[in-house]
UniProtKB/Swiss-Prot annotation:
<dbReference type="GO" id="GO:0006072">
    <property type="term" value="P:glycerol-3-phosphate metabolic process"/>
</dbReference>
<keyword id="KW-0067">ATP-binding</keyword>
<feature type="binding site">
    <location>
        <position position="11"/>
    </location>
    <ligand>
        <name>sn-glycerol 3-phosphate</name>
    </ligand>
</feature>
<feature type="binding site">
    <location>
        <position position="264"/>
    </location>
    <ligand>
        <name>ADP</name>
    </ligand>
</feature>
<feature type="binding site">
    <location>
        <position position="81"/>
    </location>
    <ligand>
        <name>sn-glycerol 3-phosphate</name>
    </ligand>
</feature>
<dbReference type="Pfam" id="PF02782">
    <property type="entry name" value="FGGY_C"/>
</dbReference>
<dbReference type="InterPro" id="IPR018485">
    <property type="entry name" value="FGGY_C"/>
</dbReference>
<dbReference type="InterPro" id="IPR018483">
    <property type="entry name" value="Carb_kinase_FGGY_CS"/>
</dbReference>
<keyword id="KW-0319">Glycerol metabolism</keyword>
<feature type="binding site">
    <location>
        <position position="13"/>
    </location>
    <ligand>
        <name>ATP</name>
    </ligand>
</feature>
<feature type="binding site">
    <location>
        <position position="12"/>
    </location>
    <ligand>
        <name>ATP</name>
    </ligand>
</feature>
<keyword id="KW-0547">Nucleotide-binding</keyword>
<feature type="binding site">
    <location>
        <position position="11"/>
    </location>
    <ligand>
        <name>ATP</name>
    </ligand>
</feature>
<dbReference type="GO" id="GO:0004370">
    <property type="term" value="F:glycerol kinase activity"/>
</dbReference>
<comment type="function">
    <text>Key enzyme in the regulation of glycerol uptake and metabolism. Catalyzes the phosphorylation of glycerol to yield sn-glycerol 3-phosphate.</text>
</comment>
<dbReference type="InterPro" id="IPR018484">
    <property type="entry name" value="FGGY_N"/>
</dbReference>
<feature type="binding site">
    <location>
        <position position="133"/>
    </location>
    <ligand>
        <name>sn-glycerol 3-phosphate</name>
    </ligand>
</feature>
Length: 500
């Protein structure tokens, strides 16, 4: 039997999952690593922590599965997107900590670019908006703030990569500097229509072309690992950013299929097929995957705070000890209270895109307690998803509640309470799959497709299995009342921004 090893390098932990040829899971390993918050709105990782935790989990997963490197047909990599690493081409030493996708330090840079009128052209080429979320301004910040970095970059001494690219470079012993189209499409430097790095964008952000990796299909020959890492060489043949990998793992290969992943943040992608759809509602146009040189596009909405809001309940407020307690606690809340949490801890993502605002609670009374806060926290994720859902339906002419199929994954989907409330607020069914490791499965599929372990997308889609369908059960009047309250809460938060 052939096995495929998936590396799932996330925001708070690195994971490795061994899949069998029938897509069942043979072993899982996970290791958390430290987060660094050197200033308000700043989030960093040590690249060496990312690398070490990745290698350790891969070795652990192989041991748990009882297999050797020779049993692995291929490795697939999926990663936290946009997180930016710049390192020395000769030594592999990072010149600065990785700047994480959540980091907002470049808000002023982005504001100036917008004020100077660059956003329409940038958006037309990249499908993105000018925002600190994306890699381009993070690279520029590193080059401008690390002594000597810009000069070294101009001399061709430094390399840039998203996390997949950095891991691939390390896995191959510095022999391969490459990424895939999905990760490239998140940098603010890549033209999603031509499939090339864009010289105008590079000039705008003053990023030398020599720093950039080669861009390949999501399923391709990316090189082989050095034999010393895992006891023998293993080829790497699949790469995709985490949200695109989840889209593939959910078998959303048909236009109109939508997946929503609930981890630290929440990310929804709607497959729009071979044609990029320009959003009129501040959604992103991105590459869902690229196979055989053919790009498939998606509309994407990004929510910065989802699971991390539950972490706030646990670590910040101390009202729960474990995330699993949140749903049962929320179920005990006072139905007469209408408490809303707008979790803009690092600003608001789609469809508002405001990095300056911060979170707020609305509707507090003397009787508001832990149950109401838990209720508001879980509901905030559902409300934010509704905002994305509504924007996608408005942007895509073929969309309707009847035509969009929503498949969910990620840690928060284990909460039946949250998924039922999501179906209620969307007034649409929500499908939870049997295999929850959809992000890793997507990476494994891309690698296994190239290695001949897995079939073409249409046949792979036949293996998708439903675990539970949540059907809407809320009255229209209640739904509208709740959504109106959420809209007022968001309006209140946006009004607090001095820049508005």
């Amino acid at each position: 039997m052939s096995f495929v090893l998936a590396i799932d390098q996330g925001t708070t932990s690195s994971r490795a999952i061994v899949f069998r040829s029938d897509i069942s899971i043979a072993a899982v390993a996970q290791q958390e690593f430290p987060q660094h918050f050197p200033a308000s709105g700043w989030v960093e990782h040590e690249p060496e922590d990312i690398w070490t935790s990745t290698v350790m989990t891969c070795r652990d997963a192989l041991d748990k599965a009882g297999i050797k490197a020779k049993d692995i047909a291929a490795i697939g990599i999926t990663n936290q997107r946009e997180t930016t690493v710049v390192w020395d081409r000769a030594t592999g030493q990072a010149v600065h900590r990785a700047i994480v996708w959540q980091d907002r330090r470049t808000a002023d840079i982005c504001a100036k670019l917008k004020a100077d009128g660059y956003e329409p052209d940038v958006s037309a080429k990249t499908g993105l908006i000018i925002d600190p979320y994306f890699s381009g301004t993070k690279v520029a910040w590193i080059l401008d703030h690390v002594p000597g970095a810009r000069e070294r970059a101009e001399r061709g001494e430094l390399l840039f990569g998203t996390v997949d690219c950095y891991l691939l470079w390390r896995l191959t012993g510095g022999r391969v500097h490459a990424t895939d189209a999905t990760n490239a499409s998140r940098t603010l430097l890549f033209n999603i229509h031509t499939g090339q790095w864009d010289d105008t964008l590079l000039k705008l952000l003053r990023v030398p072309r020599s720093m950039l990796p080669e861009v390949k299909d999501s399923s391709a020959e990316f090189g082989t690992t050095t034999p010393d890492l895992f006891g023998g060489p293993i080829k790497v043949s699949g790469i995709a950013g985490d949200q695109q990998a989840a889209t593939i793992g959910q078998a959303c290969f048909t236009p109109g299929m939508m997946k929503s992943t609930y981890g630290t943040g929440c990310f929804a992608l709607l497959n729009t097929g071979a044609t990029p759809v320009k959003s009129n509602n501040k959604l992103l146009t991105t590459i869902a995957y690229q196979l055989g040189g053919v790009r498939t596009y998606a509309l994407e909405g990004s929510i910065f705070v989802a699971g991390s809001a539950v972490q706030w309940l646990r670590d910040g407020l101390g009202i729960i000890k474990h995330a699993a307690e949140t749903g049962p606690l929320a179920d005990k809340s006072d139905s007469m209270q209408s408490v809303y949490l707008v979790p803009a801890f690092v600003g608001l993502g789609a469809p508002y895109w405001n990095p300056r605002v911060r979170g707020a609670l609305f509707g507090l009374t003397r009787n508001t307690g832990p149950a109401e806060l838990a209720h508001a926290t879980l509901e905030s994720v559902c409300y934010q998803t509704y905002d994305l859902w509504a924007a996608m339906r408005a942007d895509w002419p073929d969309a309707s509640a009847a035509t969009i199929v929503l498949r969910v994954d990620g840690g928060m989907t284990a909460s039946d309470w949250t998924m039922q409330r999501l179906a209620d607020l969307l007034d649409a069914p929500v499908d939870r799959p049997m295999i929850q490791e959809t992000t890793a499965l997507g990476a494994a599929y891309l690698a296994g497709l190239n290695a001949g372990v897995y079939p073409e997308p249409e046949k792979f889609a036949d293996n998708w299995r439903l675990e539970h369908r949540f059907k809407p059960a809320m009255s229209a009047a209640t739904r509208q009342r709740k959504l109106a309250g959420w809209a007022r809460a968001v309006k209140g938060v946006l009004a607090s921004d001095e820049g508005e």
